[in-house]
Amino acid sequence: HVVQVIDGGSVSKITDIKQATLEAVRNPIGTQALSKLVHEGDKVALIVSDITRTWSRTKDYLPAVVEELNNSGIPDADIFVIIATGTHRDNDDEEKRLILGDALFARLQVFDHDAYGSEANVFLGTTSRGTPVYIDKRAVEADKVILTGGITTHLFAGFGGGRKSVMPGLAGVETIKHNHLLALTDEVGGGVNQETYLTKIEGNRVSEDMCEVCAFLNPCFLVNSIMDAEGDFVRIVAGHWYDAWYAGTQE
C-alpha cells in the first residue's frame, strides 16, 4: 500500500542553460569570478561525475564553463577532464561522450580516476577522524581544480554534489573505505549511525569528513546543477567549493 506521496514544490525551470551558467561563474558564491581565479599558463583539471550521475546533465552546462576558461586565457590544450569514478569502473568512450557531449569529448583530454592504483594517488595527510587522504595525482598536480556535478539528497552523506566529487570521486580506496565506515556506529554490531542520514550536514560525520578530505585538495572553484523531479535545470550554483555547494543544499 502507498502510505503517502510527497511532491516537491513548484520551481521555475531554467530556459537558457548557457546564460545561467555564465551568470553563475561570473557572480559566484564565496569567491571571485572564475575569470579572476585562473591565469594564462595554468593547467586546469575539470572534475566531472561518471556515467552513474548523468542526471546532473554535465554536458549541458560544461561547455559554458570551458568557454569562460578559454576567454580567460586557458586554451583547450591546458584543460583536462578527470572522471570522478570513486571505486566505480572506468567509463568507455561512448559513456564519456554521454557525460561530456561530443564536442568536449573531441576537444579535451579525458581520464578516469583510479582508486586502486598506488601510483595513481598521492598521500596528503590524515583527517581529524583518522581518514588517510589519498587523492588522484593528476588533480593534485594541476594548477587549478574545478569541481562539477549535481546536488541531490544522499542516504548517509546528507547531500550529494560538492565535496563528493573529491571524496569519494577522486579518492583512493583506503580513503573511501575509512570515510564510509563512519556511516556505522563505533560499536561492533551497532548498525547505522543515526546522525548520518538524508539532508543532514551539520553533525553528520560522514559529510564533515568528506569536507576535510576535500580541503586537502582545496579546489579553486565549483559548478553544480540542481534539477527538478522532471530532470530539468532549476538552478546552477558556482563559487567556493563549500560555500556554493552549501547554498545549493539550502534551495
Regions found by a protein language model. Give the residues of each.
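N-terminal amphipathic/basic leader segments beginning at the initiator methionine
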Residues: H1-A24
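Short helix/loop capping segments that flank catalytic or ligand/cofactor-binding pockets
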Residues: Q4-I6, T15, W55-S56, L147-T148, ...
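Glycine-rich phosphate/diphosphate-binding loops that line cofactor/substrate pockets in enzymes
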Residues: I29-I47, G73-D76, L217
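Histidine-anchored nucleotide/phosphate-binding helix
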Residues: T54-I74
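Short internal beta-strands
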Residues: D76-T87, N224
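An acidic, phosphate/nucleotide-engaging active-site surface
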Residues: D90-G160
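A short, gly/pro- and small-residue-rich
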Residues: G158-K177
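Membrane-embedded hairpin module used as a gating/binding unit in multi-pass transport
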Residues: G191-E251
